Amino acid sequence: MGSPAAPEGALGYVREFTRHSSDVLGNLNELRLRGILTDVTLLVGGQPLRAHKAVLIACSGFFYSIFRGRAGVGVDVLSLPGGPEARGFAPLLDFMYTSRLRLSPATAPAVLAAATYLQMEHVVQACHRFIQASYEPLGISLRPLEAEPPTPPTAPPPGSPRRSEGHPDPPTESRSCSQGPPSPASPDPKACNWKKYKYIVLNSQASQAGSLVGERSSGQPCPQARLPSGDEASSSSSSSSSSSEEGPIPGPQSRLSPTAATVQFKCGAPASTPYLLTSQAQDTSGSPSERARPLPGSEFFSCQNCEAVAGCSSGLDSLVPGDEDKPYKCQLCRSSFRYKGNLASHRTVHTGEKPYHCSICGARFNRPANLKTHSRIHSGEKPYKCETCGSRFVQVAHLRAHVLIHTGEKPYPCPTCGTRFRHLQTLKSHVRIHTGEKPYHCDPCGLHFRHKSQLRLHLRQKHGAATNTKVHYHILGGP
């Protein structure tokens, strides 16, 4: 008996297995460790390392240029003389198969040199950030140095693998081997809202005040930057200002002058002029004009907060954010605001006042925008739509969280066990398993729970509570 035919015009179904890619990568790593189907032996520092060509090609622009076409089919043993050190290459090989990069202050320079050699730009950037974050707590500000061009072959292939986030560019697309300066990096899509930005960016970098780290081929950290004097300052500033007008700022792998990079000043001002950084602590009191002082023997002024260099003191005034930009101050926490209405909304944080209430369910809010978002629950309005599956959401934050299901991203790893999570709040709840914290307390019976959902279930089952309201849990009966 045959199965019934599908009705005409019925919708199809596509199910995405978000863990499939990580499972495949894990299986490939297990095959590598067992030496199964490995088709190339890499000789790095005299040490043989077995691997799969397909994985190497997918992760490295250097290996793509070596193994592409028929010429790479017969390559069974590949020696890298004068290339990366074994202690720098081994972590990269593990990263290709596990998506986890292990860095320490001792191994980071070697990993950086190996990643540059293999044209793995995303790893190069991660090493730069790690090294910079390691030096900034010591009060040392690093500046870019002249970087040597990469030595591996860079013959342009006719085609290249598909580019994707978390994978390097093939030789034709790699900025590290191009002649022109690279284009500015696009913002991290995982840092689009403030919670993810705070976790991913602020926790991974001690500060963004210093310029990107430049590494010598020996892997030694570059020396501390210093302020130039006299003609040296004027010539450096003039050359850097002219280069900034011609095109974008070059990256850390290009040849840079010490004053050519552009980042954010330590005092919070955007860097729109050439600058130099030192590790000397300066007094941060006074107005922007008072904090600008002339450099000895030159016509340039430097900011005493962050050693920014400008052609005149008024130039620093426009860079340093002054108190006059935010005249409204909170008397309790000294926070400053540009508009009076923002200060009034902020005060409700201290007073606990919630003047805006929902006329349907009575829920109260301290900001009108929160009430407007809440009202969509009752009206059924869902203005934010997923372009992949068509699902709609009340809040844009819910849409951002939903999109991660399609991309398969899990950007939040547990620092204890390494388990990765799609959402920051899920990670916070998971960490309580390791810490033993149980912050949710049942008043009637004194029990503590690790998760709010456990408390809600307990209140419903044991105490007959109505937990379907955000205002409070109303216990209807006794235990």
Swiss-Prot record:
GO molecular function, one term: zinc ion binding
Region feature (Disordered): 143-190, 210-259
BTB domain ranges (all copies): 38-105
Comp. bias (Basic and acidic residues): 162-172
Zinc finger extent (C2H2-type): 328-350, 356-378, 384-406, 412-434, 440-463
SMART domains with a match to the protein in the record: BTB, ZnF_C2H2
Keyword list, A-Z: Metal-binding, Nucleus, Repeat, Zinc, Zinc-finger
Residue spans crossing the bilayer: none
Subcellular location, record wording: Nucleus
Function: Acts as a sequence-specific transcriptional repressor in association with BCL6. May function in a narrow stage or be related to some events in the early B-cell development.
Stated name of the protein: B-cell CLL/lymphoma 6 member B protein
Originating species: Homo sapiens
High-level lineage: Eukaryota, Metazoa, Chordata, Craniata, Vertebrata
